[in-house]
A protein has these predicted regions:
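Two-component/phosphorelay signaling modules centered on CheY-like receiver
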Residues: 8, 16-37
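Receiver (REC) domain active-site loop signature in two-component systems and cognate sites
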Residues: 60, 83
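C-terminal output helix
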Residues: 111-124
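Active-site beta3 strand of CheY-like receiver
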Residues: 49-55
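Non-catalytic signal-transmission and effector/linker regions of two-component phosphorelay proteins
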Residues: 1-10, 23, 127, 131, ...
Length: 151
């Protein structure tokens, strides 16, 4: 069995104050964090950092959070990454658009620290359960291959 690694959280926000606040809030968690400052940077960091969760702002330069989310959720290699949109937008239409883009959850700014941390914990737990289910699925498929006809 592979050794477990720390959870990885990517903070994607073009506002340095928001990034600093989120980093302070996440400091008590046993996780690694990285920062992306715009939509394209977010996609680049996803490829190199391989996050379990992205805290994604919607209103960013180059690509909006909606566009980033839609691209990530549309790609089989990245669709399993949990996305929590953390944004100043809070109208029902914004939430609907975020859900349609594929977000897993939505949190309006200003964020409450406890609410953010609980949502992050739940989403990371869910991500790890999904990873374990996938690992077991591959294991079972391997067992079936070795016990099938001609084995």
């Amino acid at each position: 069995m592979a050794a477990s690694r720390k959870s990885r959280i990517l903070i994607a926000d073009d506002n340095a104050t928001n990034v600093e606040l989120l980093e302070v809030y996440l400091a008590g968690l046993d996780c690694e964090t990285a920062v992306a400052v715009d939509g394209r940077d977010t996609l680049d960091k996803v490829a190199s950092f391989k996050p379990d969760l992205i805290l994604l702002d919607i209103m960013m330069p180059k690509l909006s959070g909606f566009e980033v989310c839609k691209q990530l959720k549309g790609d089989p290699a990245t669709r399993g990454i949990m996305i929590l949109m953390v944004t100043a937008l809070n109208e029902l239409g914004d939430i609907e658009r975020a859900v349609n883009a594929g977000t897993d959850d939505f949190l309006s700014k200003p964020v409450n620290k406890l609410e953010l941390l609980k949502r992050v914990e739940i989403m990371l737990r869910l991500r790890h359960v999904e990873d374990e289910v996938e690992r077991l699925r591959r294991y079972i498929e391997g067992m079936e291959d070795s016990t099938g006809p001609g084995a």
